[in-house]
Swiss-Prot record:
It comes from Saccharomyces cerevisiae (strain ATCC 204508 / S288c). The modification N-acetylalanine is found at residue 2. GO terms for biological process: endosomal lumen acidification; Golgi lumen acidification; proton transmembrane transport; vacuolar acidification. GO terms for cellular component: fungal-type vacuole membrane; Golgi membrane; proton-transporting V-type ATPase complex; vacuolar proton-transporting V-type ATPase complex; vacuolar proton-transporting V-type ATPase, V1 domain. The gene is VMA5. Keywords: Acetylation, ATP-binding, Hydrogen ion transport, Ion transport, Membrane, Nucleotide-binding, Transport, Vacuole. Its main location: membrane. The keyword GTP-binding does not apply. Present with 21114 molecules/cell in log phase SD medium. PANTHER family: V-TYPE PROTON ATPASE SUBUNIT C (PTHR10137:SF0). The lineage of its organism: Eukaryota, Fungi, Dikarya, Ascomycota, Saccharomycotina. This is V-type proton ATPase subunit C. The keyword Membrane applies. Belongs to the V-ATPase C subunit family. One of its GO terms (molecular function) is ATP binding. Coiled coil: none annotated.
Length: 392
């Protein structure tokens, strides 16, 4: 069913000998069984086309099998990290594979129409060389994304620190973006300006008493510079020699003197620091999103080329030569994975020999010790045929 292709979270990549027939449906053609009988025809099944690769010795294949398993997991983890980063940036939904196209098509369509990229991964190379090429490229992409992500997080932290200076009430926040030169007495030998954050409930008290908080306060010099929900910010002009006396008395009356020496250079510097932090954060965010989305596509493509190699190597180890196999990718509707896998094992379990023959109750017997001679070398959890579950 085509709908399964777009609703599936799970895919099964399966390889069978070319002439294998389902024992649960004698006389049925294998392709017809996949499309019409498997879980009632609700799965979407398509051929997964893999070219023939240069095959070395049996020992070489076993080593490559182990390496492919490791690289498969590493690249899968890289994809998970990229999706996590994009989700953190609100650049993709939870179902990332539905929102990030591969080669301009949704992931399910890419899997349905998978083709080996012969220009990039040339077939005259050995399997070992192909593994190295794909692995190295994926590792470099992963490293690039992680490095850019670290730089972005650093810029984000710096911006948050700059933003904190602009937040909070007038008793604690930075004042560099609030005050103006005309709020201060500048370049005077004797006079200076003090800023005071006054709780709104004490505004009237301050206006009545500020001239008496110390000697040499300029009469009627207090004016409101700014106010918020909690405080009113006043400036007061007085003699420099009386600043300490004034601020001490102000604190005793629950007024809050703000330590602030007006400097156009400092104010300009602080504004530039904030603007620079904001600009860098935004620039790195754009760079990270672009890089992560590009890397996602490339790493995902690499991932399925590794899976193609893995299926091929495992199939040769299981079924031997010539390398003619029936390889399918199955889009499994939600909540049908266990049933689909069970029906596949019922139909093709005989390929595993006695280990997967049915017992007297008709159930697959996995306890037999006579597993395929390479089972312990090929897969941790042995299946009667080549099968990989892919969770997206």
């Amino acid at each position: 069913m085509a709908t399964a292709l777009y609703t599936a979270n799970d895919f099964i990549l399966i390889s069978l000998p070319q002439n294998a027939q389902p024992v649960t449906a004698p006389g049925s053609k294998t392709d017809s069984w996949f499309n019409e009988t498997l879980i009632g025809g609700r799965a979407f099944v398509s051929d997964f086309k893999i070219p023939e690769f240069k095959i070395g010795s049996l020992d070489t294949l076993i080593v490559e099998s182990e390496e492919l398993s490791k690289v498969d997991n590493q690249i899968g983890a890289s994809i998970g990290k990229i999706i996590e980063i994009l989700q953190g940036l609100n650049e993709t939904s939870t179902n990332a594979y539905r929102t990030l196209p591969i080669n301009n098509m949704p992931v399910p369509e890419y899997l349905e129409n998978f083709q080996w990229q012969t220009r990039k991964f040339k077939l005259d190379k050995s399997i070992k060389d192909l593994i190295t090429l794909i692995s190295n490229e994926s590792s470099q992409l992963d490293a690039d994304v992680r490095a850019t992500y670290a730089n972005y997080n650093s810029a984000k932290t710096n911006l948050a620190a700059a933003e904190r200076k602009k937040t909070g009430d007038l008793s604690v926040r930075s004042l560099h973006d609030i005050v103006k030169p005309e709020d201060f007495v500048l370049n005077s030998e004797h006079l200076t300006t003090v800023l005071v954050a006054v709780p709104k409930s004490l505004k009237s008290d301050f206006e009545k008493s500020y001239e008496t908080l110390s000697k040499n306060v300029v009469p009627a010099s207090a004016s409101v510079i700014a106010e918020d929900a909690e405080y009113v910010l006043f400036n007061v002009h007085l003699f420099k020699k009386n600043v300490q006396e004034f601020t001490t008395a102000a604190r005793e009356k629950k007024f809050i003197p703000r330590e602030f020496n007006y400097s156009e250079e400092l104010i300009d510097q602080l504004k530039k620091e904030h603007d620079s932090a904001a600009s860098l954060e935004q620039s790195l965010r754009v760079q990270l999103v672009r890089l992560a989305k590009t890397a996602y596509v490339d790493v995902f493509i690499n991932w399925f080329h590794i899976k193609a190699l893995r299926v091929y190597v495992e199939s040769v180890l299981r079924y031997g030569l010539p390398p003619h196999f029936n390889i399918k990718i199955i889009a499994v509707p939600p909540k049908n994975l266990s049933k689909c896998k069970s029906e596949l094992i019922d139909a093709f379990g005989f390929l595993g020999g006695n280990a997967f023959m049915k017992d007297k109750k008709g159930k697959i017997n996995k306890q037999d010790t006579s597993l395929h001679q390479y089972a312990s070398l090929v897969d941790t959890e042995y299946e009667p045929f080549v099968m990989y579950i892919i969770n997206l």
